[in-house]
Amino acid sequence: MRLHHLLLVLFFVVLSAGSGFTQGVRNRLSCHRNKGVCVPSRCPRHMRQIGTCRGPPVKCCRKK
């Protein structure tokens, strides 16, 4: 019975840790950690948007 409880707890820990990867980039530090750069307008053609840096006007862009 203890094994079932341990596996259940481990399952929830794995699920809660994975939820952060679905949220995207929302600040400058996490943008740079994801190998991106902050651009005040649209991303250049050779880059794609992966999030925002300081709100909607500033985009976080990374090479395609």
From Swiss-Prot:
Belongs to the beta-defensin family. It comes from Ovis aries (Sheep). GO terms for molecular function: CCR6 chemokine receptor binding; chemoattractant activity; identical protein binding. The lineage of its organism: Eukaryota, Metazoa, Chordata, Craniata, Vertebrata. The keyword Protein biosynthesis does not apply. GO terms for cellular component: extracellular space; membrane; microvesicle; sperm midpiece. GO terms for biological process: calcium-mediated signaling; cell chemotaxis; defense response to Gram-negative bacterium; defense response to Gram-positive bacterium; positive regulation of flagellated sperm motility involved in capacitation. It is found in: Secreted; Membrane. It comes from the Eukaryota. Monomer. Homodimer. Residues 1-22 form the signal peptide. Has bactericidal activity. May act as a ligand for C-C chemokine receptor CCR6. Positively regulates the sperm motility and bactericidal activity in a CCR6-dependent manner. Binds to CCR6 and triggers Ca2+ mobilization in the sperm which is important for its motility. The keyword Membrane applies. Disulfide bonds join C31-C60, C38-C53, C43-C61. Keywords: Antibiotic, Antimicrobial, Defensin, Disulfide bond, Membrane, Secreted, Signal. This is Beta-defensin 1.
